[in-house]
Amino acid sequence: MSRHINTFLIVLTAAVLGGCRNYLNVQPQGEVIPSTDEEFASIIHNRLREIEGGGDEYVIGNMDALKHLEGCADDLDANIKTSASLTFFAGEEITARQRAYEDSWEIVRDCNIVIENLSGRDSDIAKGSLSAAYAMKGIIYYNLIREFCQPWSDTDADELPGIPLVDRFSISDKPSRGTLRQSYDYASAQFESALALDPTDPKYIFTTWIVKAYEAKLDFWCCKWDKVISLCEDIISNSGISLTPIGEYAAMINSQYERKGEVLVRSHINNSSELDWYFSFTKGYLASRPACAALIRLFGDEPKKDVRYEASFDKKRMNVKTPECKVRLSEIYLMLAEAYCHTGQTQKSLDLLNELRRNRIEGVVDYTESTLPSVREGDRIVVDCYGNALTPLMQAIFDERRKEMYMEGDRWYELKRNGRPVWWVISNGLKYTTDSYLYTSPISKSDVDLNPSLIQNPGYVY
């Protein structure tokens, strides 16, 4: 649960969290340690129900996760309007991000319990639960790498601090942080273990193509372009999912509960979730700040020809797009287009970009190398993930990504991945600067206090 839901449900949440923290020490209270496949499966299904109901912030994510990410990024213009209900500065979120670090480990703990006890069992329940446990653990590590590690660097990955590599939990263990490269390898191994079990049962959510999509996202973040190309080509060619066409886009992107069209996976598919009342407030918070002019300008002189425009904004530039965390085929296209661009396969990159645009913009004319818009001056992102100045093709990919992934929690990580630009917001006469170090959240201070071998991230001194 988020800190906001905790405020409303403090008594219930305290009881739940109390139970979570004592999960590995239940015998003194007279509880029964799980032993059967069904009992271990229930641990996984509790986590899957959180995803379906919208309560999960740390695997697929929910509206609370989006509220943090979209509030701290620059797609919404905090210089025009700020409010207490919607964050506008990452520095305000330091305590909440430490709590996110702690809560993520509770999910890893549950996954490890299932992995340790169901490995080698051959029932359908055991294999389904085990594959879901590996998949969720891999996704958690991917999310921890994005949030709590510095951006990927091929030259520094063996020295940069990563995430503790935890196969099992013990009260006496105090694991230190692995390197960034070790963390990538560990997360990748979780996805491979999930895929080795041939996950096909949708009731465990994380079926083959969904696992491959998250593995591609991990490889994309860590600049493994050959792997990105292999995985994304496989998904596009063999998953049976295709880009949602213009006429069906609005219904797909603003579906309240259903997974429609090109969506591989999304949160909050339970239309009787007990959290719906809370999310109605969250939607209002996200619609309380107008989109920034730089984003709106990307839609050109005739913005309504781009189906994404009216599906995202009202006449006052306020958000109307349904804020749900999801993975869509359009993201796979964009990752593949960028991977081709980084590997010098310009025409393949252009072909993918043009195919996406034809499914979004009425009457659009395909780009060629000679007709790509020149690189603009004054944009926030001016370099790619290697620190190289943007080319017209890379800028075009970034522009489509910004329009396509608006209000899906992507922009903050694009800023982090591509240069960590420093920028500021004025509120109530004060200047709030997003410095480069703020793109990487601090690991939990309480963890550092308990385990001095844990290295805190740069910029945070307690």
Region annotations inferred by a language model:
Residues 79-148, 178-179, 191-202, 227, ...:
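Conserved, well-structured interaction surfaces
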Residues 147-186:
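Short coil/linker segments at helix-helix boundaries
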